Amino acid sequence: MLPLTKIWLCYGIFSAILMIFMIVLLSVSKHFTNSFYRVITMDIILNLLCWVNTWPSRMVFREDGFGFARFLYEFYNKSFDVSFFLSNVFFHVQSASTICICCHRLSTAIFDNSNRFWSRFYLLVYALIILYSFLAVQLLYRAPIKFDYELNKFYSEPATLDQRLSVAMYLRCFMSGYLLAIIIIALSTLYQVRKRIAPFDHLHKNLLRKMSLIAFSHTFVFTMLLAWQTLNSFVVYASFIELLMIVSDMISFSMAYILLIFDGNVRSVIKNNLPVIQINGRRISDAQRSQNNIT
């Protein structure tokens, strides 16, 4: 196994476990009843599925992934076409989900009954996001991936010049559109949240600030990576696929780490429920008591 694949697996498996843990935590804990956490949970679920779906695409043309790719192809010869199709679907899903998170914060800052609306309709909103993403991909040309049994290697059917130009224009238009939409909504949200926070009590202010910080941190990460993708669509790299996969992983895993860093409730619940942390905490407390008794 090549070093890059080992790196992908090491940080990927750890991050995937963290994401699953966050999904369970946000779904079952009574501390996370706000609709914001329902939206965040959906975002993490979809990003986890996105990461799983990247593996056929990232391994098909790598020498250390040949056995895995050959097995998938012989099991179902459309596996890589489906994976490539879903990768493009997830590009739209991730972008629209980030916009959805921004819209949640914006609507919460403007409307008093926003939490009730999102609690009722967040599943419908994400169903519409997925439907839109599938429809948007229909505009994109997808070159099928096949296996040459004589040469014993995978290959992608060559696209015509018009098809390549069409794909480049498609990506640039959607990336630029998403980037612009995210920036506009994020700035509007920032203005509304600052205006909204003033009249509330200290506890409510802290809640608004915390949720806004999580949303803005995720938006910032996604915006920077989307800007990078947009700019680099004009440049061709020899290792573009490897770079693209790393960027995709950063987007997919970002929300779980942002919650862990910025959400005090998440850290508090983890601290109070993980046996190892509780045992260590008791040992420290016992040691401190012993020292106090000695002195």
UniProtKB/Swiss-Prot annotation:
GO biological process: sensory perception of chemical stimulus
Membrane topology recorded in Swiss-Prot or TrEMBL: Multi-pass membrane protein
Pfam family, one: Srg
Coiled coil: none
Cell location: Membrane
Chain segments annotated as transmembrane: 7-27, 39-61, 121-141, 173-193, 211-230, 241-261
Tree of life domain: Eukaryota
Keywords attached to this entry: Membrane, Transmembrane, Transmembrane helix
GO function terms (MF aspect): transmembrane signaling receptor activity
Stored PANTHER family: SERPENTINE RECEPTOR CLASS GAMMA, SERPENTINE RECEPTOR CLASS GAMMA-RELATED
Family as reported in the entry's similarity comment: Belongs to the nematode receptor-like protein srg family.
Protein name: Serpentine receptor class gamma-53
Source organism: Caenorhabditis elegans
